Structure formats: structure tokens, C-alpha cells
From Swiss-Prot:
Chief subcellular location: plastid
UniProt name for this protein: DNA-directed RNA polymerase subunit beta
Assembly and interaction partners: In plastids the minimal PEP RNA polymerase catalytic core is composed of four subunits: alpha, beta, beta', and beta''. When a (nuclear-encoded) sigma factor is associated with the core the holoenzyme is formed, which can initiate transcription.
Cell location: Plastid, Chloroplast
EC number(s) stated in the UniProt entry for this protein: 2.7.7.6
Keyword Transferase found: yes
Record-stated family: Belongs to the RNA polymerase beta chain family.
Protein's gene: rpoB
UniProt GO MF annotations: DNA binding; DNA-directed RNA polymerase activity; ribonucleoside binding
Catalytic reactions of this protein: RNA(n) + a ribonucleoside 5'-triphosphate = RNA(n+1) + diphosphate
GO CC list: chloroplast; DNA-directed RNA polymerase complex; mitochondrion
Length: 1073
């Protein structure tokens, strides 16, 4: 980010910058740090020594391109070479070689990595920063108990607590605690040093009994006492080296390694001057912490707010990759030790190259990217989704919180989040508040803190010289920070104005001359998702949250369209997403087609730019680039060459501007349902393309290898019509549900005994040979119909059972909008399409145009997302005047009712220019009288009409609709399975049963709870009677779920039986359940 001398100018940082900086820091610093920690390895006789040299390492440029890595399901990585030396101590000779120690997955231009052909991204984690924190809690008597918690770099905790008698204890486990004197002595201090280094020696002496003196008489005694309490060991343990090692490993290593950040925090909190390279907890730290705790007890010092961002640190991509590199080197160390021992045992002469294998590093990174909770598959639904995913911040993950243990205070917005973490953008559900999003201008500092930029105002002029500062959360408490920018203050004389400001986590109104810093940008506090919502200041925050989440679910449409009303950030989002093709140098277009653009560069060299053609994203949306330049045109560096999915002219374009009326229509927009015109279907307004991938593998079985073939016995020729001579579906074929995509036969042993006797007799009469293979073809599942656009046959070298051949078939589907699809605006106004009306039946305007969509007006007042009304009316004015608007939020800071004035003035101008008085009617501005398409009569009340930007979301009915006639049943309850993927059934739950009971439909209810559910015999009889014909017999015994309940009660020693009462003589007939 740059700040020049001009008033309030700045450039928005690259949205992928956080990821790039993290990866660069890992390559530049993290690798060297970890290699320098690699120990010298010696053999048992200490004759040979192996070591790695940190000065020189080399990353080789990848051999394969990104696209090839994705297509072939390989990892886009670079080979790492390090210098290693082998020293023979007897002859003092050294052999040095450059050795290959493994592959490191590289980051591409999108800030993501490609592992096994899948785009993956590492998200940043928020952890409690290592250091010391003071808190107080009320005990059962209502007395404040003060504690000091030391958190290590590994997340281990050591608690110091002070009791009523001012004695200080260190809690070593949940139940055990030891005196602070014993802990200090065990760490190497004697009593004299302890008393010299504390501020309150008399308090320490007050609880020094004879027993205590004996415990701290020597270091050995203190360690034994500490070990007894820590390990809960009875008797008298004997001091030994192994006992010290156990304590070191289980206690000191986990709870006393502070790290670089922890040392800095403890020095700052306790006013110590211990060198930064001393990353372990020292007796001086413990004693200073105890002094501070005594001060707290007597009312001195302040308690810590654990949720303040100054007490948090960001574990970035660099830290996670460095941790994994250290883990891989530890594994490599064990391998080298084993190899040296083996070489000496077999009397072989080792070389550095022979001792090292690339497996530990390569497998460590592959398992990290594949299994670690913070490494996620990149969501590529649309360009916005790709960018936002890399800017997530998570409290979850290893060393962090879980969705069930995190309390409300952690999830809540904190004043220190201002300008660093977006107060709006978070996930809904159990993880609300635990997964956040970085604010636009926030960056990660050197110490793992989140920094936000501000303009510094100098005392003399308050505006002449402006300098940009990045402040960490611990720094900005000391400044008065004005929330507005100078434009908002220019309405009057600045010196006389009171401005809203922030000081010490409070929001105040202060005089302009008292301000030290001011904000640099109206969007500074929001994430990218929230910054794309126009008029966000008029919306309730809950709806803004939904909107920022739903924009990430928008499907790229076949013909994208820019929004009329936007915020100005659309261009930056599109450019940083990497979806449009951008010229890397200036030149002249020599050739262009759908697959590539050829550009002449400096001199005679030409540059070929390949375009993405119908590429599948991991959400099955279609990624496609369309050339925007003509042959012979001269272009400049940075110019848009081709638009991608959901971008137009280099701007983000997720939806469509369509004509909308807010009115009820025959109950079809009840409860957020949406009524649409058939024009949206036939005009392909909301048509999108989806690409599905189907894959099959061939294995080598015990009976022999599987075969790909077109000759499949027992199958109709109709199903095999699209296969070529190899048995694979042909490119361009139209395929329907059930068609064979790849023909495959699996060998099986033919056993005569497995057939029924009459089957064997028939085979003998007709001379039919017993089949030696069974058909295991790849068939197109339900809902998969479409056009085959690509077929890939991936053959690994040396095709074994471990390296099977893979055949992939890609099928493109064209999906128009239909009943059951989900649409949404940019203000959290979402709905399901309930009916598609003929255009002649839709309500129409005074100029005869039918509206495209009808929303329910009751969805606005209760949800308080009034921004949609402003956008709707301004969109109508923009479409009539052929204008586009880019509006920054919080425009009311410049003038009262600024948004309303802008909208009404634009509507008035549109009314004048188009000579349509109905566009702006002074009695009800923004509303208009419209007519019923069925009768031609005007509606009773004027209705608000406009052109908002409406998105089609990825929750589509084609992916959700599902039916079942019969299928699999659960083994225990004998009820149908749940879910579409398992061909499951519908559950008739408690409330559904009540609804049916309310209508008295006893027979339907009985069917649903027996034949259609878990009555095994009745199920079979129903099948028989429906085939043969006849009446369905009534089930007499209980269904399986009732029998399961009886068995579960019996396991609790409760026996349950039921009785049948005779209708004639009311005799009880006992019958066993």
C-alpha cells in the first residue's frame, strides 16, 4: 500500500498479498531457520559426522505447468537441493555434495497450491499469543482470586495463583500445585537469589516453614519434590538423570518454551530486559510474574482482556509450512541415523547423497495439504469466492478452539477488531464468530499481530503533511483515531467541529484538534464480501452477513452483466482473482481465437497467451475465458485481454439487473417465495453451465486384469450406442441417465455350483457358456444428462494394481432457471422460485413492460434490510439514464439523508429525460401504479418497482431433487437410509405424524409407519401383491423399530409385553412381543 503527499490517496493492497507474503517469508527465512537447527549426526563410534549447510539452498523451477499438474492429478512443486557434508574424523577428510531432499509444493499466482491435481489453500489461524495474562475470578465466598497464566509457544499453560494468606502457588496439574519457591529452586535458583530478585521478600519469607526450607535446601531436593507433585508419585523417589529428562520432556519443554513472540510479550508485560534470543522461561520471569501477582492482590496493575487482539497472534501460512518443514527434517534425521548405522554394519562407504532420501519431506507436505484442518480445498464457485477463501481467519484447528467449547465472549465483536477483522463477515451456524475475514487494508505484522493503516495528522496544520502508519492492536489504544475522513469534515470550519473518534476501546465525540490519526478509507473496517454491498449502512448487520456469504455462492451465468449500482470494488476483486487474462507487456495483437491470443512483444519475440476453455471448478461450475481484443489492436501493459467466468470488462459480474416489483401475487410469494417471468427462462437470462466429472479405474484383480471394452454381454445395444471401438464414450455425444460412459469387464471365477439346478439344466440344453466376467461399467447417474466435452485416459508408468489406469469423462450441462432454484439479492433477501408465469400474465408497467420478478414486500420491514429499496430505485434510474453508479458506504456522514436525496434526484432526472412521469411521482416517490397482466386492471396500491442486482445461487433444484421407490435399509432399525447420496427415503418424524393425525388419516399413517418404513414381512408382501394384484394384507405384528425399543429396554432390565383383548368376551390373550 502506498501513501503519497496528496490528501487521502491510497491504493488498495492486493487481496492475495497475505498469502504471497507468508509463502515468501517461509522460502526466504523459514527454510534457513529450520535447516540451521538440523543437528550434526554422528555414528555410534563417533568416526563419521553428517551435517547440512544452511548457506546455500536451491529451489528448481518446476518441470510441469500448473494446468498439466491439475489435468494429470499431480503436485505442482519444486525440488529442494541443499549442500550436505560428510566428515571422517580420523582422516579429517570432508565430502560435500549438493543433495536433493524433497519436493515443496509451490504457491501459484492465485495464492493457492496444487496438490494431487486439487487447488488447496492454507488459511490463517488466530491463537492466544504466548506470554503472561492476569485474570481474577470470584470463588464460592465471593472473594476475588487472582491468577497469572503463562502460555508457552506450544500452547501449554502454567498457572500461578495467590491465596488468602498471600502465598503463591504454581499449578502443575489439574489437582496438584507446588510452592513458587520449589518451582524456582527446581529451575536452578537458590533462596538468596530468590529474595534478591523480588520486590516483596517479606511475603516470600512469611510462608517459608522448616518443611519448605528442607524442600528447597538443594536443587536435587526441589526437583524431587516437584517430580512427586507433578507425576503424583508416592514414596521417596531417587534423584537420577532419567527423572530429570522425564521432567524436561513432559513439563519444561511443553510449558516453558516461550518462543520469540512469548519472550517479547513477557518482557513488555513484566518490564524485563532479558535478551530476545532467550526463548525459554527463566526463574527471573517466574519471580517477576509472582511480584506482579502480589501487586494485583493489593490493587496495583491492570487485568488482561484475553479477547483483545493484542493478546492474540496470527499463525500464518509461513508458520504452518515452517512447522511442517521442521517435522520433515526431524524424520530425515532418524532416516540418516539408521542409514549410517546400516552402512557401517555392512562395511559400505557412505556418501551424503546415499544417506538422504526425499520421502520424509515429500510425504510430510502431501499429508499436511491433504489432512490438516487449516489446509482446505479452494472454493472456486466464482471469482469472489476464490479471493475471500484465502483471507479467512479461523479460531479452530490444532491448538485452537472447537465449535462446542468456544463461549459467547470469544465469538463476539471486540473493539480491537476495528479495521482488522470484519465485524460482519463470518460463517453462520455452530462456527459463528470463530471463522472471520480480514478487513480490506489489514496486514499481518512481523510479530504475528494484525495491523491496520491510519493517516497521521501533524499538530500545526492537521492536514498539510500526511503520513501513513500501520498500528498493531497494542499501539492504537494510545491514539485518538477519527472515524471520518476529511471530506466529511469539510462542510464547516474543521477546527470548530466535533468528530466521532475511538480512544482506549471507547467510541467518543471529540474536538478535531485533539485527533492524532484518522481512517484512510470508508471500507477500511469491512471484508471484501461486505464491501461489495451497496447501501450497507441501511441494512441490519445480520442480513449483511447473509449477503456477504451468499455472494460467494453465486453461479457464473452464461452471459454476465455488470451491476448498475455497485461500490467500486468490483474491478479490484476481478483483477486479483486471476480470472480475466491480463496483458503482461505492451504490444500488438497478431492473432486471436477461442483458444489463444498471440501478442507481439519488444523486438521480434511473440508471446502466446492460452485461454481457459470450459474448465471445471470443484463446485462443478464452468470456468471459461472469452477474448475481448481484436486482431491488429495495440494494447498496453495491464489491459484486459479476455474476460473470465462472472467478469465483464474486468469487473466482477455475479448476477443480472432485472425489473422487480415488490408486491403480493396470489400467495405465490408467501414466506420469501419468488415469482418469475418465463422471459428469464427463454431469454437464457439466468442460464448457467455446469461441468460434472465421472471417473473409473481399472485394477489388476486376483483373477486377472480388468478390461476396457465395447463388447459387453447382456447389455442392450441402445445403452452402448455412444462408445467408440475402445469402449469409451465419444466426444460430443449427448448422454442420458443410465447410458454407459466406459465399458468395463471384471474377471470372476465361474462356479457351476453357484447357479440354481434349473439354471444349470437350461444352460446345458441351450449350450450357453458360463460367464467368466461381470460387467462393472461406468454408467451415467440420475440427473447427469448432458454433452461429453472431454475424455481423459491417465496411464501411470508401470501400470500395477497400486497405479491403476484412470478414465475421466467430463459432461457439460446447460441449466435454465426453474421452480425450486434459489435466488438472492445483495442485501440478504433470498428466496426460492415458486412459479414461472407466462409474460402476458405478469404485472406490467405504464409503458407496457412486464416485470421479470415479484418479491414479497413483507420481507423488508421486519428484516430491516432497507438497502435493497435504495438499490432497486437507483437501478431503475440508472437503466433509464444508461448510467452506472459506484457508491461508497456511510454517505450520511457528508449530509443528512444523502442516500435518499441521491436516489430521488436520479429518479427525477430519469423521469424528465425519458418523459415518463410515472418514474417519479411526487405523491409516492419511487413507487408507481402498475397493471395486472391477466385482467389489465391497475392494482389497488402503488408498488415499488426497480432494477436491483439479483444472483442465482448454487443451491439448485437439480442437485437436490430426489425420489426413491425401494433401496437400502439400515441394519439396526431396518428403516430407509438418509440422504440423496445413499438413495435414502423420506423421514416421517414426530411433527409429520402430528400433522397426519390432525387430519385423521389413519390408513395413510399406518402405511407410512409400517409398509413404507420398517416392517420387514409387510414390505415383502406389498411387493408381491403389487406385482400379482390383490389386496394388501394388514400387518399383525409390531414393526422393527418398536422391537428395537423393546430390546433396548430389556438391556436396561425392563421387560415389556403387550396383550390382545378378545372382542367377544374381553378375555386377555397374553402374547410375547
Amino acid at each position: 500500500m502506498l501513501g503519497d503527499g496528496k490528501e487521502g490517496t491510497s491504493t488498495i493492497p492486493g487481496f492475495n498479498q497475505i498469502q504471497f507474503e507468508g509463502f515468501y517469508r517461509f522460502i526466504d527465512q523459514g527454510l534457513i531457520e529450520e535447516v540451521s537447527k538440523f543437528p550434526k549426526i554422528e555414528d555410534i563410534d563417533q568416526e563419521i559426522e553428517f551435517q547440512l549447510f544452511v548457506e546455500t539452498y536451491q529451489l528448481v523451477e518446476p518441470l510441469r505447468k500448473e494446468r498439466d499438474a491439475v489435468y494429470e492429478s499431480l503436485t505442482y512443486s519444486s525440488e529442494l537441493y541443499v549442500s550436505a557434508g560428510l566428515i571422517w574424523k580420523t582422516s579429517r577428510k570432508m565430502q560435500e555434495q549438493r543433495i536433493f531432499i524433497g519436493n515443496i509444493p509451490l504457491m501459484n499466482s492465485l495464492g493457492t497450491s496444487i496438490v494431487n491435481g486439487i487447488y488447496r489453500i492454507v488459511i490463517n489461524q488466530i491463537l492466544q499469543s504466548p506470554g503472561i495474562y492476569y485474570q481474577s475470578e470470584l470463588d464460592h465466598n465471593g472473594i476475588s482470586v487472582y491468577t497469572g497464566t503463562i502460555i508457552s509457544d506450544w500452547g501449554g499453560r502454567l498457572e500461578l495463583e495467590i491465596d488468602k494468606k498471600a502465598r503463591i502457588w504454581a499449578r502443575v496439574s489439574r489437582k496438584q500445585k507446588i510452592s513458587i519457591l520449589v518451582l524456582s529452586s527446581a529451575m536452578g535458583s537458590n533462596l538468596r537469589e530468590i529474595l534478591e530478585n523480588v520486590c516483596y521478600p517479606e511475603i516470600f519469607l512469611s510462608f517459608l516453614t522448616d518443611k519448605e526450607k528442607k524442600k528447597i535446601g538443594s536443587k536435587e531436593n526441589a526437583i524431587l519434590e516437584f517430580y512427586q507433585q507433578f507425576s503424583c508419585v508416592g514414596g521417596d523417589p531417587i534423584f537420577s538423570e532419567s527423572l530429570c529428562k522425564e521432567l524436561q520432556k513432559k513439563f519444561f519443554h511443553q510449558r516453558c518454551e516461550l518462543g520469540r513472540i512469548g519472550r517479547r510479550n513477557i518482557n513488555w508485560r513484566l518490564n524485563l530486559t532479558i535478551p530476545q534470543n532467550n526463548i525459554f522461561l527463566l526463574p527471573r520471569d517466574i519471580l517477576a510474574a509472582a511480584d506482579h501477582l502480589i501487586g494485583m492482590k493489593f490493587g496495583m496493575g491492570t487485568l488482561d482482556d484475553m479477547n483483545h487482539l493484542k493478546n492474540k497472534r496470527i499463525r500464518s501460512v509461513a508458520d504452518l509450512l515452517q512447522d511442517q518443514f521442521g517435522l520433515a527434517l526431524a524424520r530425515l534425521e532418524n532416516v540418516v541415523k539408521g542409514t549410517i548405522c546400516g552402512a557401517i554394519k555392512h562395511k559400505l562407504i557412505p556418501t551424503p547423497q546415499n544417506l538422504v532420501t526425499a520421502t520424509p519431506l515429500t510425504t510430510t507436505y502431501e499429508s499436511f495439504f491433504g489432512l490438516h484442518p487449516l489446509s482446505q480445498v479452494l472454493d472456486r464457485t466464482n471469482p469472489l469466492t476464490q479471493i475471500v477463501h484465502g483471507r479467512k481467519l479461523s479460531y479452530l484447528g490444532p491448538g485452537g478452539l472447537t465449535g462446542r467449547t468456544a463461549n459467547f465472549r470469544i465469538r463476539d465483536i471486540h473493539p480491537s477488531h476495528y479495521g482488522r477483522i470484519c465485524p460482519i463477515d463470518t460463517s453462520e451456524g455452530i462456527n459463528v464468530g470463530l471463522i472471520g475475514s480480514l478487513a480490506i487494508h489489514a496486514r499481518i505484522g512481523d510479530w504475528g499481530s494484525l495491523e491496520s493503516p491510519f493517516y497521521e495528522l501533524f499538530e500545526k496544520s492537521k492536514k498539510a503533511r500526511i503520513r501513513m502508519l500501520f498500528l498493531s492492536p497494542s499501539q492504537d489504544e494510545y491514539y485518538m483515531i477519527a472515524a471520518g475522513n476529511s471530506l466529511a469534515l469539510n462542510r464547516g470550519i474543521q477546527e470548530e467541529q466535533a468528530v466521532p473518534a475511538r480512544y482506549r476501546q471507547e467510541f467518543l465525540t471529540i474536538a478535531w484538534e485533539e485527533v492524532h490519526l484518522r481512517s484512510i478509507f470508508p471500507f477500511q473496517y469491512f471484508s471484501i464480501g461486505a464491501s461489495l454491498i451497496p447501501f450497507i449502512e441501511h441494512n441490519d448487520a445480520n442480513r449483511a452477513l447473509m449477503s456477504s456469504n451468499m455472494q460467494r455462492q453465486a453461479v457464473p451465468l452464461s452471459r454476465s452483466e455488470k451491476c448498475i449500482v455497485g461500490t467500486g470494488l468490483e474491478r479490484q476483486v476481478a483483477l486479483d482473482s486471476g480470472v480475466p487474462a491480463i496483458a503482461e507487456q505492451e504490444g500488438k495483437i497478431l492473432y486471436t481465437d477461442t483458444k489463444k491470443i498471440i501478442l507481439s512483444g519488444n523486438g521480434d519475440n511473440t508471446l502466446g497467451i492460452p485461454l481457459i476453455m470450459y474448465q471445471r471448478s470443484n463446485k462443478n461450475t464452468c470456468m471459461h475465458q472469452k477474448s475481448q481484443v481484436r486482431r491488429g489492436k495495440c494494447i498496453k501493459k495491464g489491459q484486459i485481454l479476455a474476460d473470465g467466468a462472472a467478469t465483464v470488462g474486468g469487473e466482477l459480474a455475479l448476477g443480472k439487473n432485472i425489473l422487480v416489483a415488490y408486491m403480493p401475487w396470489e400467495g405465490y410469494n408467501f414466506e420469501d417465495a419468488v415469482l418469475i417471468s418465463e422471459c428469464l427462462v427463454y431469454g437464457d437470462i439466468y442460464t448457467s453451465f455446469h461441468i460434472r466429472k465421472y471417473e473409473i479405474q481399472t485394477h489388476v484383480t486376483t483373477q486377472g486384469p480388468e478390461r476396457i471394452t465395447k463388447e459387453i454381454p447382456h447389455l442392450e445395444g441402445h445403452l452402448l450406442r455412444n462408445l467408440d471401438k475402445n469402449g469409451i464414450v465419444m466426444l460430443g455425444s449427448w448422454v442420458e441417465t443410465g447410458d454407459i460412459l466406459v465399458g468395463k469387464l471384471t474377471p470372476q471365477v465361474a462356479k457351476e455350483s453357484s447357479y440354481a439346478p434349473e439354471d444349470r439344466l437350461l444352460r446345458a440344453i441351450l449350450g450357453i457358456q458360463v460367464s467368466t466376467s461381470k460387467e462393472t461399467c461406468l454408467k451415467l447417474p440420475i440427473g447427469g444428462r448432458g454433452r461429453v466435452i472431454d475424455v481423459g485416459w491417465v496411464q501411470k508408468k508401470g501400470g500395477s494394481s497400486y497405479n491403476p489406469e484412470k478414465i475421466r469423462v467430463y459432461i457439460s450441462q446447460k441449466r435454465e432457471i426453474k421452480v425450486g432454484d434459489k435466488v438472492a439479492g445483495r442485501h440478504g433477501n433470498k428466496g426460492i422460485i415458486s412459479k414461472i408465469l407466462p409474460r402476458q400474465d405478469m404485472p406490467y408497467l405504464q409503458d407496457g413492460r412486464p416485470v421479470d420478478m415479484v418479491f414479497n414486500p413483507l420481507g423488508v420491514p421486519s428484516r430491516m434490510n432497507v438497502g435493497q429499496i435504495f438499490e432497486c430505485s437507483l437501478g431503475l434510474a440508472g437503466s433509464l439514464l444508461d448510467r452506472h453508479y459506484r457508491i461508497a458506504p456511510f454517505d450520511e456522514r457528508y449530509e443528512q439523508e444523502a442516500s435518499r436525496k441521491l436516489v430521488f434526484s436520479e429518479l427525477y432526472e430519469a423521469s424528465k429525460q425519458t418523459a415518463n412521469p410515472w418514474v417519479f411521482e411526487p405523491e409516492y416517490p419511487g413507487k408507481s401504479r402498475i397493471f395486472d397482466g391477466r385482467t389489465g386492471d391497475p392494482f389497488e396500491q402503488p408498488v415499488i418497482i426497480g432494477k436491483p442486482y439479483i444472483l442465482k445461487l448454487i443451491h439448485q433444484v437439480d442437485d437436490k431433487i430426489h425420489g426413491r421407490s425401494s433401496g437400502h435399509y439400515a441394519l439396526v432399525t431396518q428403516q430407509p437410509l438418509r440422504g440423496r447420496s445413499k438413495q435414502g427415503g423420506q423421514r416421517v418424524g414426530e411433527m409429520e405424524v402430528w400433522a397426519l393425525e390432525g387430519f385423521g388419516v389413519a390408513h395413510i399413517l399406518q402405511e407410512m409407519l409400517t409398509y413404507k418404513s420398517d416392517h420387514i414381512r409387510a414390505r415383502q408382501e406389498v411387493l408381491g401383491t403389487t406385482i400379482v394384484g390383490g389386496t394388501i394384507p394388514k400387518p399383525e405384528d409390531a414393526p422393527e423399530s418398536f422391537r428395537l425399543l423393546v430390546r433396548e429396554l430389556r438391556s436396561l432390565a425392563l421387560d415389556l409385553n403387550h396383550f390382545l383383548v378378545s372382542e367377544k368376551n374381553f378375555q386377555i390373550n397374553r402374547k410375547e412381543v
